[in-house]
Amino acid sequence: MAPQLLLCLILTFLWSLPEAESNVFLKSKVANRFLQRTKRSNSLFEEIRPGNIERECIEEKCSKEEAREVFEDNEKTETFWNVYVDGDQCSSNPCHYRGTCKDGIGSYTCTCLPNYEGKNCEKVLYQSCRVDNGNCWHFCKRVQSETQCSCAESYRLGVDGHSCVAEGDFSCGRNIKARNKREASLPDFVQSQKATLLKKSDNPSPDIRIVNGMDCKLGECPWQAVLINEKGEVFCGGTILSPIHVLTAAHCINQTKSVSVIVGEIDISRKETRRLLSVDKIYVHTKFVPPNYYYVHQNFDRVAYDYDIAIIRMKTPIQFSENVVPACLPTADFANEVLMKQDSGIVSGFGRIRFKEPTSNTLKVITVPYVDRHTCMLSSDFRITQNMFCAGYDTLPQDACQGDSGGPHITAYRDTHFITGIISWGEGCARKGKYGVYTKVSRFIPWIKKIMSLK
């Protein structure tokens, strides 16, 4: 009987196993549905917390509505959502001519500046020389309804019709040893200073005009020329314009019995290494008003140093090199409308580093901001004529001084350096409320070209 009972129990157990399995193990579809991770709903604490873009849309995938709840601003939401969905379509800067790019989903939109159109603002509707210089690297002029670019001497127009390509190693205005990290300028906080009108001096006395400048390294001011008198002393500066022409101030010419020229030097104390170049002829502008004489203008303004410009013709050509390169001569329009609307120009020379102190043995250079004409005129007790302009600082002790006269005022544009002024005069050196006064080269372009064309 016992064996029969045991057998019945075993059979009953085996018969119940399939039913037990079905109760313990779920079917695959049901199990997968059960194990899927569902999005966690915010707890009551999270619901009352301010929206957080990282929690809502980065840690978890969010909807546009959730993003809007975070930003609480439709425009900001659209900007974020366009990038969030498929990346930033504007990252490659697709808009030409300084157009503004707005990202979209799978696309972008360019907002073009005036006179430009097209998906990427690539089409020029109406070019003007007054808008970004007509996109010209050097000179721009209007021909019918289009702009036409041209280049300074020793450059050729690039195939794009805008750029200028140097035709030689020593083309004008090329600063071959240009400063890289050590810019020929003053710190940003200095350059940002605006010219401020201060009270006029009660004792005006026009004085030949670098105070507190930096050393100009070899080849960094390659257009600088130095005028030497019969005693071997520096008395003025100049600017190389061509192998046989040096531009200077007219008032420099009557200061000595003879004139020699030195180029390519940054330290004139080493007399044994410097080479004096002989002068063939000097051309002084016939309307020049000398410093020892001034006339009373019809408006009763005292005028001196007007037409302060002269050109020296060399007996033998100047040999160009990395350290000796001429400055480029601009057109009048380019100088007035482009160069003189830049923030600043560069002035260099061997003049006195302090008022009534000895001249410097080393070449100095400073960056001087342009001063608007109204401020310039009100700052001086002497008349600022149309042939002059002001540059410098109203409070900082940075200026040209005695011995710098005749030297270059250079303005750079697209890595080419153009002559824009001649150091002429000032009321003292680096005086508070006073600026350096320069001969405005753009007023004399025809005269300069005429003299340079003489045989």
From Swiss-Prot:
Positions glycosylated per UniProt: 92, 254
Q: Name one GO molecular function term.
A: serine-type endopeptidase activity
* Positions of the catalytic residues: 251, 308, 405
Spell out the reaction equation it catalyses.
Answer: Selective cleavage of Arg-|-Thr and then Arg-|-Ile bonds in prothrombin to form thrombin
* Residue ranges the record assigns to the propeptide: 21-40, 182-209
Principal EC category: hydrolase
Give start-end of the signal peptide: 1-20
Quaternary structure and interacting proteins, as annotated: Heterodimer of a light chain and a heavy chain; disulfide-linked.
The name this protein carries in UniProt is: Venom prothrombin activator notecarin-D1
Lineage runs:
Eukaryota, Metazoa, Chordata, Craniata, Vertebrata
